C-alpha cells in the first residue's frame, strides 16, 4: 500500500507521546523515581494502550508516565534523540515532531527555555547522525490555561529559528480556541506556520474557530468536520490539510470503529488529508501500520491510500525546494 517511489511522511507525531517504554523504565531507575512497575512487560500496560479508552483525556493520561521521568534536561535531550532514531527504524523519510515544553517541564519544574533548547539539540544531533530530516512544531498545552500557554509560547519563541510552526493541543472542550487568539497572532507575526488540534473532542465549530480565529493552515484530527458540509467544502476549496490519525482516533473512542472514520469521505471530497501516527509509543503502532492495516480497515481504496501518502508531502511545512529534495532522494534509491 505504500508507494516506495515517494517519500513516507509523518506530520502529526508527538515527540512527548513517543517515549519508549524501555526508556521510561531506565530513566525511572536512573533518577530513582517511583513507577507503577519495575519490569518492562509489567510497565507496558501503564504506558501503552491495549484497547480503546473512554475519551481523549483518558488517553492522555497514558502519556503522563513518559513525561514523569523527564527529571533533567539530559533526559529531554535523550528522548528527542531517540524519537529521530525511531523515525529511521520505521522507514520514515521526513517528519514534523511536535512537543509541549510546559507538559515536559511541569512534573520536575524544569526551565521551559531549557526544555526547548534540549529538544532542538537532541533532534538536530540525531537528524545529522541518522539522516532523517525533521522539522519541529511547538505545542501550547491548552489544558494548563492561558497564562501557562503564554509562558510556553515565550519559551518556544526563544528557539523560533529552529521551530517551523505552532500548535494548540490538550483539552479541546474545556479550553476552546478563542481563548488563545493573541497567542497565535504572535506566532504568525514570528513567521510560523499554524496547525491546530480541532474537531477531535469538540465539534465542527472548533475547526471553524481554528481557521478563522487562529489562522490554521492544517487541522489535527479534524474528525468532526464530517458534521458540516459547508466546512467540508471550505477545507477542500482552501487547501487546508487534515492530519488524520486513524488508530489514535479509534483508541480515544473519537470514532466507534475504523470503518466509521470519515477519512475516506474527506479524500472523496477533495480535502487534502494524510496518514499520521499521533503518539506511536503509547498506541503501540508505527506509520506502516496506518497504511497497511488501519487505512484498509477504514475503507480506503488502494488509490486513496496512495493519495494520502502524496498529500503528506504537499501538506508539509517545507519550501518547494525542500520538497523536491525529498522527491529526488526517493527516485535515486
From Swiss-Prot:
GO biological process, one term: adenosine catabolic process
Matching Gene3D superfamilies: Metal-dependent hydrolases
Keyword Hydrolase: yes
Substrates-to-products reaction catalysed: adenosine + H2O + H(+) = inosine + NH4(+); 2'-deoxyadenosine + H2O + H(+) = 2'-deoxyinosine + NH4(+)
Catalytic machinery residues: 200 (proton donor)
Record-linked InterPro entries: A_deaminase, A_deaminase_dom, Ado/ade_deaminase, Metal_Hydrolase
Pfam family, one: A_deaminase
Sites where the protein binds substrate: 14, 16, 170, 279
EC number(s) recorded for this UniProt protein: 3.5.4.4
Spans through the membrane: none
Any one annotated GO CC term: cytosol
Residues marked Important for catalytic activity (site): 221
Residues bound to Zn(2+): 12, 14, 197, 278
Record keywords: Hydrolase, Metal-binding, Nucleotide metabolism, Zinc
Record's cofactor remark: Binds 1 zinc ion per subunit.
GO molecular function: 2'-deoxyadenosine deaminase activity; adenosine deaminase activity; zinc ion binding
Cofactor: Zn(2+)
Function, as annotated: Catalyzes the hydrolytic deamination of adenosine and 2-deoxyadenosine.
Family according to the record: Belongs to the metallo-dependent hydrolases superfamily. Adenosine and AMP deaminases family. Adenosine deaminase subfamily.
NCBIfam families found in the cross-reference section: aden_deam, PRK09358.1-1
Protein name, as recorded: Adenosine deaminase
Organism per entry: Edwardsiella ictaluri (strain 93-146)
Taxonomic classification: Bacteria, Pseudomonadati, Pseudomonadota, Gammaproteobacteria, Enterobacterales
Gene: add
